[in-house]
């Protein structure tokens, strides 16, 4: 899990530190910078995956625009001003992503290489990590000359020495247990063989913003798999879950949670092998036998949003760390509160970490602020226009007599307009 994120010089953010839990809810005025925080994290993820072209940024949910609009406009704009995102995981893995853009036509953001980048890899992941990194360095050696070539050769020799030690079960000391490297080039794609490691989860970070049209058109698939940021790929994903023995029971568990909807009875997903139908069957307890079942086209959009959220949180096939922008969209206020409570349980059970933004006060009532893994943040802008963040905590030893939704509406939490 990600423990801490620091952001500098990104859009409305001059400098900010964010300490995360497992489920994190952002509230704040329109334009306060909630989405800017999410986009800065997604930009770091794109840098970690070495995919900084605009088409890859958009696929992650980033509003890619001119470089001068990506940098903070709160100071004099210059190509020399870099965007910085520093990430620390709970296992103390840490990276700093320094990004620059030369503002030339058709150019893309570049990750500034730092000679003191550190990475820690432990246990059985060590050999896999070193083999992948060595293959990358040997390929890179074929494309460089001069001083860079000598640096790479020295790096390769050091890596080969570490790899020999790591393969030796009788070796004692650091190489067998924990490795720290100072590299001249990118190591992000090889950090943490496990998809659940902190920095691997940054690489996968997406900003989901499901759309009604994408959820209803089950034949549409997105650039990102298994689930696109607007909900693309949901039908195929359900088919995979339903047919894969390794994920037996996941669809049944999703179906059980969908009973938050009073009318809902059951869900049937056609097999990918035996059916050419791109639709699911939804049982409504109020429908007569003659009327049959609903499909995704005739169902209400709230059902589709819940189906997407529960699918996203219920399996290791989806990212470990992600955001959902406007999680309250299309949902009844009371349902929003129950949804957040359900997502907190699913996140804990399936190793997920999420940031949710909302404008619906009722959403907050699903949070248990006595649980340190569930956190509420108010996003605002100061007199200079800088985005600021404040965590709302339950006072120790004191039970709240007011619902969070009421505290939000009455202005006790902040995050409301002050100009009217």
Locate each region found by the language model:
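Pre-Walker A-like glycine/lysine-rich segment at the N-terminus of P-loop NTPase domains
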Residues: 1-50, 56-69, 76
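Phosphate-coordinating catalytic segments in nucleotide- and nucleic-acid-processing enzymes
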Residues: 48-308, 312-317, 395, 407, ...
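Walker B catalytic acidic pair
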Residues: 325-326
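C-terminal lobe/lid and adjacent interdomain/linker elements of RecA-like ASCE P-loop ATPase modules
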Residues: 56, 60-61, 71-78, 338-420
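Short loop/turn elements that form and flank the Walker-type P-loop nucleotide-binding site
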Residues: 1, 14, 19-21, 317-318, ...
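Residues immediately C-terminal
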Residues: 12, 329-330, 363
